[in-house]
C-alpha cells in the first residue's frame, strides 16, 4: 500500500499563465494545463484541465476545474464495433448531477439521484450541439460522453465548463475528431463604472443576477496551433506560444437571452441588447474560446494519445452519386418547386423509390447508398437554386415571411388560448393561472429552487404526419420549451404586480420550420388572452443561410422564416426572438467554419424586420391583456403584521383551514406577512379577507352585538361559543333552555352546533358573557 498526499496545491504548484504550459506530476502520472480568463476590472477566472488520475479505463478522461471549488469529470468511451443498420452517428451525451457536489442529500423518497433534471438535460444539449460536428463523418461506433459534476461552488454555473471538459476528454480518446471546442458564458454587466456595459466571461451567480444580457458561445480554431511537447518534471516551465488571434475562431453555437430585469434597467438608461450589442458579445467571446481551445491542444499534445482505427461508412459512393444525379436530378428539380409540404414530401418519396428501382440492378445490395445519394442530390438542387436565383422551395423571396394566421380564445375553459399559424407550422398556446403555491419546486445543484413561469413544449408525431412514441418529453422538447421560456421570461410581470404562477403550454400541431419561434408568438397571444400584463409583446423568427461559390465568388444568402427542408439543407439555423426594441432570446447553430461578421449582422437586421412584421400582425388581433377568464382564480393580496402570522395560521393550521372551509378561498402566507387569497368569486375572497383582518387587526366586540356562533366546548356550567376568530364567549347553563331549568348543557346544545347569541357583558379582563337570542 502506498500512502499519497491529496492536497491539490502540493501536487501542482499554483501558478497561472496564458502560454499553456503543461504540468506533469511523475508521482501521480497526471498532466494538467490552465487557461486564464482575464475579465479586466472584473478579475480573472482559471480553467484547469487534468488527466491521468481518474477514470483511467475510459478512452479519454479529463477532470475540469473552475478556480478551486468547481470540479467535474468528463469521460469519452466508444464501442469496439460499429452498430449495424445505423445510418447516423450514435453519439450520446449525459450529464450526471451529483447532489454531494453541493453538500446536499437528494430530496427524493430513496434519497438518491434519479432521472436527469431540466438543467442537466439542457447542459447535455449545450455539449452535444458543438461537439457532434467535430467527429469524422461516417463513424458508426457508439460514442458516449459522460460529465459528472463532483463539486460545485454555489457562485458558479457548471454547464459551460462541461463543454470544455467534454471536448478535452474527447480529444484524448483516440477517436477520429477534428480540433477541440471551447465554450464560454458571456454576461453584459452594466454598473456605475461601466455605463456602456462590459462583457464578462464565466460570470458568477451574483454577476449573472445583475447582468443585462447573457449568452453561451461555443467555437473552435480554424487553424490549429500545436505547442511543443513538454519535458517530464514535477513542474513545467513557462514557454512562449503563438499569440491568439480571433479571426481564426469559428463560432459553432450561440445560446443567448435577456435577464428578467432588462426592461426596468433599459428604462433607467442602460443600453438595450439590440442586434449590434449582441453581435459585439459574440465577437467578445472569441479570444476566450481561442484561449480554451489552445489549452486543450496543449494537453492533447502532451499526452499524445494513441489514435485508434475506426471503420467509416460513407453514406454513398461516388459512382452511386453520379448515377443518381443523372437519373433523378431533373425530376427532383421539378418536385422541389411544389409549395405544399405534404404533396412535395410524397412526390419526393415516390421519386426516391423509382430511382432505387431504376438503379438497383446496376448497384445490387446498395439500396441505402442510392437513397442517401438521392438526398444529397436534393440538397444540391435546393442550395444551387437559392444561390443562383434566390428561388426558394415554396416560391418565396429570401426575405419573405409565409402567410400568418392569428386567433385567440379557442379553448373554452382554458384561462387563455391562441392559435398561431405561419405557413404549415401551427402552434396552439394555452395559459393556466394558479396561486403562488403552485410554483414548481426545483431540486437541482443550482440556487434556483422554484419557478413561477413554467413553459412546456409538446411535439406529437402527428405534427409531421407520422406515428411515434408519446409520453414523457424528449430532450428536444425540453430544449425548445426552455428557448421559448427564455424569450418570454423577461416580459413576465413581477410577483407583486401579478401574484400568479403561470404555466404556458405550446402544442406543435403542425411542423414545417421553427415551431419553437412559433411557440413564442403563440404564447404572447395566449398570455394576453389570459389577462397577463406582459411588459411588452414578444415574437420570434427562424433565419437560415446558404453559402457557396457563384461565378467564382463566395456568396452568402440569408433566408427569412425557413422551412424544415431549408433548415436541413442549409448552413445555419438562427432563431431570434424579441420585442419591438430589443432581443430577448437567440439560438444559433451553424455548419460552417465561421460566419463573416457582416453576414451575421445582416441576418440580425433581417430578423428584426421580420419580427416587427409579425408583431404588427399579432397586434391586429390582440395588443393588450384581455379581462381574466371567469374560470381563472382571483387572487387578492393583503398584508398582516409579521407578529400576527402565527395567529392567522392557528395551532396546526386550525384557523387558516377553517377560513378555507367556510369561504372556499385558498390562503397562503409569506414570511414577510404578505397574504395571497385565491378564490373563484369575488365574494369568497372578500369573506376570507374579512376573516383574516378579524384575526390580524381585531376589534373588541360591543355589548348588544349579535353573532351566529359555533359551540366549541361544553362544561358543567355552560357552553363556550366562538363568535369571532380567537374570540369565544360563555353562555351560562342558566341561560340555556329558555325559562326551564336544565340539568345538562348537552340536553340543549352540543359541540359544533350553530347558536345565535348576543353579548350581555364584557368584564374588565375581556371575558364575554353571552345569552341566546330568542326567535
Swiss-Prot record:
Listed EC numbers: 2.7.7.8
Q: Does the keyword Ion transport apply?
A: no
Composition-biased stretches (Basic residues)? 231-243
Q: GO molecular function: any one? A: polyribonucleotide nucleotidyltransferase activity
Broad class of where this protein is predominantly found: cytoplasm
The reaction(s) catalysed by this protein are: RNA(n+1) + phosphate = RNA(n) + a ribonucleoside 5'-diphosphate
Q: Tell me which residues make up the S1 motif domain.
A: 704-773
* A biological-process GO annotation: RNA processing
Stretches for region Disordered: 223-247
InterPro entries of this UniProt entry?
ExoRNase_PH_dom1, ExoRNase_PH_dom2_sf, GPSI/PNP, KH_dom, KH_dom_type_1, KH_dom_type_1_sf, NA-bd_OB-fold, PNPase
Q: What does this protein do?
A: Involved in mRNA degradation. Catalyzes the phosphorolysis of single-stranded polyribonucleotides processively in the 3'- to 5'-direction.
What NCBIfam families has UniProt attached to this entry?
A: polynuc_phos (TIGR03591), pppGpp_PNP (TIGR02696), PRK11824.1 (NF008805)
Name listed for the protein in its UniProt record: Polyribonucleotide nucleotidyltransferase
Q: Which organism is it from?
A: Corynebacterium kroppenstedtii (strain DSM 44385 / JCM 11950 / CIP 105744 / CCUG 35717)
